[in-house]
Amino acid sequence: MKKTMMAAALVLSALSIQSALAAEYSEKTQYLGVVNGQVVGNSVVKVTRTPTDPVLYRSGSNSPLPAELIIRHAESRPASGGLANITVKEALPDNGEARITLKTSLMVDGKRVALSARQQGEDVVITVPEAQQQIELRTDAPAELEVPVSYRGNLQIALQVED
């Protein structure tokens, strides 16, 4: 069984737009470290790693709570238990493609609710139930990273969440 090594970082971005003229932007980087993976089908290396911070998005305390969240350049598939698998792809310099899949849940006012997501073009739109205090998009399961077997080097995949 072949194994390969690479350094991987998951870049998580949250973009909150409060008005047409003012924007609040925050970004955090989660470093997954040097990773080893299993070669699948002689073409893809699969790596499973748990992000250090499970919170992908948290609504700002000073801003109005959103009615929906938009994840740019992503795909969504339903998962059991009211969760959704969100996959984000990143083009690589050698014309290959890396992807990360996160099993996500939606927390509204501290309680887990069923995540309702739909595909809208290249984006995923998550409908948020009415909330009083806070909204969180989180992943409590390990992330699955897939890269071409020929790829070597650092890797950053941006997960951009807008409200």
Curated annotation (Swiss-Prot):
Localization per Swiss-Prot or TrEMBL: Fimbrium
Secretion signal span: 1-22
A Pfam family of this chain: DUF5462
Keywords associated with the record: Fimbrium, Plasmid, Signal
Superkingdom of origin organism: Bacteria
GO CC terms: pilus
Function, as annotated: K88 minor fimbrial subunit, plays an essential role in the biogenesis of the K88 fimbriae. required at some step in the initiation and/or elongation of the K88 fimbriae.
Protein name: K88 minor fimbrial subunit FaeF
Source organism: Escherichia coli
Gene name of the record: faeF
